[in-house]
Amino acid sequence: MIVGIGVDVVDIERFGRQLERTPGLRDRLFVPAERELNTRSLAARFAAKEAVAKVLGAPAGMNWQDCWIGLDENGPTVQVKGTVLAVAEAKGVKRWHLSMSHDGGIATATVLAEG
């Protein structure tokens, strides 16, 4: 059963400017393993986190570090803990599906949550 679908797009150049202008933003949005990635990859991961938030109804008090994007042999994966895990479990999410891409200055992500 599909619990929800979320889609988000991020302007890579604008996102990069925000990271430069706000030094603590990278630390607030990303776990240590993500922080070392280039701006294009970070923009795609932020789009994925936004898509996860949309699936979950943009829960109040969501900690951005409670959702991170990993990689396995099949591609990108959604990983959750804490505040995000609690809402996902309450909504019956058992499995996440994620597709990310970037082209022409835009990063995009689509997330499907399955119950």
UniProtKB/Swiss-Prot annotation:
NCBIfam families: pantethn_trn (TIGR00556), PRK00070.3-2 (NF000832)
The keyword Transferase is assigned to this record: yes
Protein family according to the UniProt entry: Belongs to the P-Pant transferase superfamily. AcpS family.
Gene Ontology molecular function: holo-[acyl-carrier-protein] synthase activity; magnesium ion binding
Cofactor names: Mg(2+)
The protein's name in its UniProt record: Holo-[acyl-carrier-protein] synthase
Gene Ontology CC terms, in alphabetical order: cytoplasm
UniProt KW Cell membrane keyword: no
Main localisation: cytoplasm
Subcellular location: Cytoplasm
Catalytic activity: apo-[ACP] + CoA = holo-[ACP] + adenosine 3',5'-bisphosphate + H(+)
Source species: Paenarthrobacter aurescens (strain TC1)
EC number(s) on file: 2.7.8.7
